[in-house]
Curated annotation (Swiss-Prot):
Protein name from the UniProt record: Internalin J
GO MF annotation list: signaling adaptor activity
Similarity field: Belongs to the internalin family.
Repeat positions for LRR: 94-115, 116-136, 137-157, 158-179, 180-200, 201-221, 222-243, 244-263, 264-284, 285-306, 316-325, 338-357, 359-368, 380-402
Residues found modified as Pentaglycyl murein peptidoglycan amidated threonine: 824
Organism: Listeria monocytogenes serovar 1/2a (strain ATCC BAA-679 / EGD-e)
Length: 851
């Protein structure tokens, strides 16, 4: 601005000399213009947010467009111009790329004029605000390492690259930037980052925000690099990020990490989380792996043949197998106290080995010729041989237990990079002789050059250099150890040797056994066994035994331990005290008495034994716990509790008595009983029959359902008395010869009637059918004589036509007509004819009279 004013003043002066009138007019114009420019600049510097108002095509200097001189210079440089040069707004809009990083810019006002920008780098300035609302063509934005508290990139829909690392952002909205492939928002104070709309992301870095608790990257299937370390994330799902080759998720609160789908990973840092297990066997491309500061107890790296770096610091690993990791260059197991063994003989490429504070007790380094850095502080190592590690530049084995360092001197590079202070050596325990102890100094105490180290006795010991021994006098077992220190000439090696000691072991005497018996020799209390050294005194003591009184104290109650076993016996007599009774009850589960109680009596301390009873219909539920015990001064009760037996289920057996034709011979018998009980059946004696078949189930067991027992009989063959069949009239007169029927007892007989002329059978006798028996039987067929049909008819008409009841007249059976034709001269036919005529005439006369 000052330059402009000087130029104008010079022009005015020159013009006034040559043409005073013209100069005066021009000077007024120039002064007016200068005043306007000065006013605009001052206004711009005091109010940088107010835009310059120029007409199209008008120009002004970069300093006028951009109030921050540093920013103006950077923009001018982009046009290969000076900040004092003028430029139009249209020209500013043509700039496509601007790199103004590390330029001490504090104000980016004027950036809105650079509407053509596609790439902006304003890294490492002091910018607090950045308005990019007019820079919608931006595809690349790097504004990291500033002091931005807010950044609005929603208008930048073409953005593919965004780096806002190391600012003071508390939120960031990238939902309108779907083309983003790179996003770095690390080292801010974001509490969340939503990248659900940024599916084209290949790199995402949000580490060191410290407050992000959730991160969803499942939509980012193209992601190759992810760094979300130093946050508070508890869950991380990378199963959809199959192209991932670099993952930093260390220093979070992750408890589980599934990497089965991430087989392209070459770099993995999951240290400082809460992982109890992790499976990396699918990650065969892995070259860098850090799982330090996790509570891991197991780790399988056998498939990681390309691994060059492995850190498992401060884990709970019990072991680590490195035999398959032949490309390993860096290995750290610092703080792994539970690892006791480590084999690195297959790791010939090792450059750095750090086993500080590990639990290893030995280490073979003979196959590691490329080893440069070796850290073994605070280990349990007792030996160290680095003679094959000629490239070593740094060795530290402070606070170990190593005596011989002679191999270190073979590597000149270690002379000034070697630390071995604080060695502690514990020697085997020694035995005092007359309270004195002389020990030889360990011949293995050699410095790095193979020389014996300087010895300084402690605890009042005296060192004899000629014999290389140390002697201590008047030692006490109150402090049962002596020490001496060793130091190398250059002081690089310092340590202490401790030798524990003990007094001579005394000779142990044989034990003394103390017995406690009653006057019958029965044991009343547990024996006591006294032990001690030979000739030491012993003292036994009596015991207080309830209900017993000590009656005999042995002579050897006190004495000394000897070379033979001894016995001490205290004898007691039982106190006689009548005890309260023991009542034994027999009840059901409701407390109802089932049988009279029993009362047991005795003296205190005596043993009682209660017994159960057999009670019909009941079963003892359980033996009471106090069925046996001792009488005491208090009354006791023993309860036997019974359960009522359920009603037994019955079975039925039917007994049948039949002949060979299954015909019933006697009534069926039925017996019943409890299922499971035995039954016995008996056959019956049946007259006229003999038992021929006794059934197989004549005896058996009652079962559910009905059973059938069948006895089969055969009829006896016995000639019966005859049966006489008579044919008589009512007076017993024989009308026809009798018939005699014969058969066997039990057989059936059937008598038959006869046709007797002039007689009719009155009735069938009831015993016409029956059975032969051993007694004679008679069957009588009784006949009635037929009425006589040859008597003449009465000629006199009866006067009384009412029939009278016949009296007890004997009926005469009409003689049956002959079945044969009458002979010549017989008169019977005409008599019949006359009788018919007579009857017909009589009937006709009677009929007419009635008419």
């Amino acid at each position: 601005m000052k330059t402009t004013k000087i130029v104008i003043a010079s022009l005015v002066s020159l013009t006034m000399v040559s043409n005073p009138l013209l100069t005066f007019a021009a000077t007024n114009d120039v002064i007016d213009n200068t005043t306007e420019i000065t006013t605009d600049k001052e206004t711009s510097s005091t109010q940088p947010t107010i835009k310059n108002t120029l007409k199209a095509g008008q120009t002004q200097s970069f300093n006028d467009w951009f109030p921050d001189d540093n920013f103006a210079s950077e923009v001018a440089a982009a046009f290969e111009m000076q900040a004092t040069d003028t430029i139009s707004e249209e020209q500013l809009a043509t700039l496509t790329s601007l790199d103004c990083h590390n330029s001490s810019i504090t104000d980016m006002t004027g950036i809105e004029k650079l509407t053509g920008l596609t790439k902006l780098i304003c890294t490492s300035n002091n910018i607090t605000t950045l308005d990019l609302s007019q820079n919608t063509n931006l595809t690349y934005l790097a504004c990291d390492s500033n002091k931005l508290t807010n950044l609005d990139v929603t208008p930048l829909t073409k953005l593919t690259y965004l780096n806002c690392d190391t600012n003071k952002l508390t939120k960031l909205d990238v939902s309108q930037n779907p083309l983003l492939t790179y996003l770095n928002c690390a080292r801010n104070t974001l509490t969340e980052i939503d990248v659900s709309h940024n599916t084209q992301l290949t790199e995402l870095d949000c580490h060191l925000n410290k407050k992000i608790t959730k991160l969803d990257v499942t939509p980012q299937t193209q992601l190759t690099t992810l760094d979300c370390s130093f946050n508070k994330i508890t869950e991380l799902d990378v199963s959809q990020n199959k192209l991932l080759n670099r993952l930093n998720c260390d220093t979070n609160n992750i408890t589980k990490l599934d990497l089965n789908q991430n087989i392209q990973l070459t770099f993995l840092d999951c240290s400082s989380n809460k992982l109890t297990e992790i499976d990396v066997t699918p990650l065969t491309q892995l070259t860098y792996f850090d799982c330090s500061v996790n509570p891991l107890t197991e780790l399988d790296v056998s498939t990681l043949s390309k691994l060059t770096t492995l850190h498992c610091i401060q884990t709970d690993l019990l072991e680590i197998d490195l035999t398959h990791n032949t490309q390993l260059i860096y290995f750290q197991a610092e703080g792994c106290r539970k690892i006791k063994e480590l084999d690195v003989t297959h790791n010939t490429q090792l450059y750095l080995l750090d086993c500080q504070a590990a639990g290893i007790t030995e280490l073979d380094l003979s196959q590691n010729p490329k080893l440069v850095y070796l850290y073994l502080n605070n280990t349990e190592l007792t030996e160290l041989d680095v003679s094959h590690n000629t490239k070593l530049k740094s060795l530290s084995c402070v606070n170990a237990h190593i005596q011989d360092f002679s191999s270190v001197g073979k590597i000149p590079a270690l002379n000034n990079n070697f630390e071995a202070e604080g060695q502690t050596i514990t020697m085997p325990k020694e035995t005092l002789t007359n309270n004195s102890l002389t020990i030889a100094v360990s011949p293995d105490l050699l410095d790095q050059f193979g020389n014996p180290m300087n010895i300084e006795p402690g605890d009042g010991g005296v060192y004899d250099q000629a014999t290389n021994t140390i002697t201590w006098e008047n030692l006490s077992t109150d402090n049962p150890a002596v020490t001496y220190t060793f130091t190398s000439e250059n002081g690089a090696i310092v340590g202490t040797v401790t030798t524990p000691f003990e007094a001579p072991q005394p000779i142990k005497g044989e034990d003394v056994t103390v017995h406690y018996l009653d006057d019958k020799g029965e044991k009343l209390a547990d024996d006591e066994v006294l032990s001690g050294n030979l000739d030491d005194p012993y003292t036994s003591s009596a015991k207080d035994i309830p209900d017993y009184t000590l009656t005999t104290t042995p002579d050897n109650a006190t004495g000394t331990f000897t070379t033979t076993s001894q016995s001490v016996t205290y004898v007691y007599t039982k106190n006689i005290v009548a005890a309260e009774p023991v009542t034994v009850n027999y009840v059901d589960d409701t407390g109802k008495t089932l049988s009279p109680s029993e009362i047991l009596n005795g003296n205190v301390g005596d043993t009682y034994n209660a017994t159960a009873k057999q009670i019909d219909g009941y079963t003892l539920s359980a033996e009471p716990t106090n069925a046996t015990g001792q009488f005491t001064s208090s009354a006791q009760t023993v309860n036997y509790i019974y359960t009522k037996n359920p009603a037994p289920e019955k079975g039925v057996v039917e007994i049948h008595y039949v002949d060979e034709d299954n015909k019933q011979l006697n009534s069926t018998t039925e017996i019943s009983g409890t299922i499971g009980d035995n039954y016995t059946t008996e056959p019956k004696t049946i007259e006229g029959y003999t038992l021929t078949t006794t059934p197989g189930n004549a005896t058996g067991t009652f079962t559910t359902g009905s059973q059938t027992v069948t006895y089969v009989y055969t009829k006896n063959i016995e000639a019966a008395e005859p049966i006489t069949v008579n044919y008589v009239d009512a007076n017993g007169k024989t009308l026809a010869p009798s018939e005699t029927l014969n058969g066997n007892v039990g057989d059936t007989y059937k008598a038959t009637a006869k046709q007797i002329d002039g007689y009719t059978l009155s009735a069938e006798p009831t015993n016409a059918t029956g059975q032969f028996t051993s007694s004679a039987q008679t069957v009588n067929y009784i006949y009635t004589k037929n009425t006589n049909t040859d008597q003449p008819l009465p000629t006199k008409k009866p006067t009384n036509t009412t029939p009278t009841k016949p009296s007890n007249l004997k009926t005469t059976e009409v003689k049956k007509a002959s079945d044969t034709l009458p002979k010549t001269g017989d008169s019977a036919p005409w008599k019949s004819a006359l009788l018919g005529v007579f009857l017909s005439s009589t009937a006709l006369v009677i009929w007419k009279k009635k008419k």
